[in-house]
Amino acid sequence: MAALTGLASGRSQVVDVSAQESVMIASMGHAGRFPRTKMRGKRSGASIGVTREIWPCADGFVSFGLRGGKARVKNLQTITRLVDEDGLATPALTDQDWTSYDHNKMSRDELDAIAGPIASYFLRHTMTELYETAVETNLMLAPANSPSQLIENKQLAFRDYFCSFDGVAHLPRSFLAVTSPGDEVTRPGPTAPGPAWSERKPRSSSVSPTGAATAGAWAGTKILEFGTGAAGPIAIRYFAEHGATVIRIESRSRPDFLRTYGLGPGNPCGLEGSDMFDALNVGKLGLTLNLKHPEGVALAKRLIGWADAVAENFAPRAMRGFGLDYGSLAAEKPDLVMISSCLQGQTGPHKDYPGFGGQGAALGGYNMLTGWPDREPIGPYGTITDSLAPRFVATALASGLLYRRRTGKGVHLDVSQVEAAVYSLSPWIADYDVNGHTGIRQGNRSERFVPHGAFPCAGDDRFVALACWDDADWRTLTDVIGIDEATSGRLSTLAARLAAVDEIEEMIAAWTAGRDALATAETLQAAGIEAVPVADLGDAWADPQLAHRGHFVTLDHSCMGACGYERNGFRLSDAPAGYDRPSPLLGEHNEMVLGEILGLDATEQTRLLDEGVLE
């Protein structure tokens, strides 16, 4: 994405990517909120907050959220019915009013009484049985898939996801499915190695500058964004940061559920007070449209005519229902670039299966891999595909926009969050396919490096992370921490260290336990050992490296006041980047968009408002 953004500027660029910043933004803005919330963050095992997310079943584990909220009411009603049909329901479950259920206001005993019969139901059924039921009933539940289950997955098979390549029978083909007028663009996939650099022929680029060096790389690019939740908005935030004009379409009558996320009792800002919505939609304009009203759809189509690209992350049937699917729009605007990103893609038997990022992590294999070898899967949190998939979505959209600039033609880009997750685990899939190795949960350990992990330091919940990449690193580490020569020599090879990893970790932990995490990391770094203190959200906010790079940007939100926003991890040498506004209030820019872009006068705008078109 960074390289494509550099190309989009049309100017020579040095592209500077920070691994630290790129990982930071996966926290969905939590670090930027630290000055207001003072929440440093904590681990929660197989739970999210106070409720369990990963549950054991008859032959493995499934992901199911027991949290409240409008978006989960039907889900909770469905699981209650299923448990009751199995004869396991109790009054704590059947008498619960899910429309007002708030897990954060319940005692531990009350939550346990609700969770008990659900847990018993899961233990009666296999992962396959539970997932088939989920698909049939639109239950947001997913199996914690292993490689064998992914290779046999009906949805992935329908979408022709795996291909044979270079001795691997099942290799992820691509995270992207492509549709274009006349099928001019073929689906990407693995190819034979290209020629050596010395044999490559220079290729001229027809991408022209979008503006002067004072303009962002995507300046002049116009994007219309539909959708809800996190994955879509995160992807489009890249473009807003680098100069694109982004208009986000919302509805007052059915607001984005993320606007209700994390709202505590008495929140003075209501739907304008969600920290997470604010963090993910910084830099965008906001327009409210009622897409169930014909004039609302008509206005949306006019804006699509204005836009270079449309981005949406609704369930597949939603845009079809509005008449705003790619097939309908491309008939009128063949140069349209449109990207659709949902949990399992736009086609296939499971395309309409509902779920959040927690279900995506399970379906995509991440839950199976995360945790300790002798314990249940524990995550990763939060919702890894909501953090991972946007990188793929942004990259695909950038490619589509550059293709349009070069050719004048449009394209539809279909990204499945699950497929993006599996694509990221391609080595795991290939290892299973070739060697039959399923892999196990290893905590912080590595199969290739010992030691490799996080070790406790002085203070409350403080750790230092370190790794030895070769035998020389190991010898240096033993000198620093005072391991005797006999022990150091006995463990001088990787094979020996792999066999004695428990012993090694105990020795290191004994040395780190009474030491300050930062001082320990600096001591190890000075000796040439890679080590860092494990940062919490407060540490990240105060990090001098992040401050030097301007990672956090403070803007004044009209209701919440000063808010911290995070940059997306890369800089260009000859194109500025940043945010010119916080997230939009509901309908905040209606007058600007309708008047300045669509040319509607005040009288017409008032009529639209009175007739519910702008709800």
Segments and roles (model prediction):
Residues M1-A2, G6-L7, T128, S164-F165, ...:
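N-terminal helix-loop segment corresponding to the beta1-alpha1 unit
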Residues M1-G68, R72-R81, T179, D183, ...:
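Active-site-adjacent "lid/gating" segments in soluble enzymes
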Residues V14-D16, L141, V246, G286-T288, ...:
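Conserved beta-strand scaffold positions in the cores of enzyme catalytic domains, especially
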Residues R33-F34, R159-F162, L263-P268, P354-Q359, ...:
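Short, hinge-like loop/turn segments at secondary-structure boundaries
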Residues R40-K42, P56-C57, F64, D95-D97, ...:
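Terminal low-complexity tails and localization/encapsulation signals of metabolic enzymes
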Residues I48-V50, R173, G273-D275, F449-H452, ...:
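Short beta-strand-initiation
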Residues T51-T137, L141, P451-A527, A531:
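Aromatic-enriched alpha-helical interface/lid elements that frame and gate functional surfaces
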Residues V135-L150, V246-I249, Q525-D539, L600-Q605:
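Short, well-structured beta-strand/strand-turn elements
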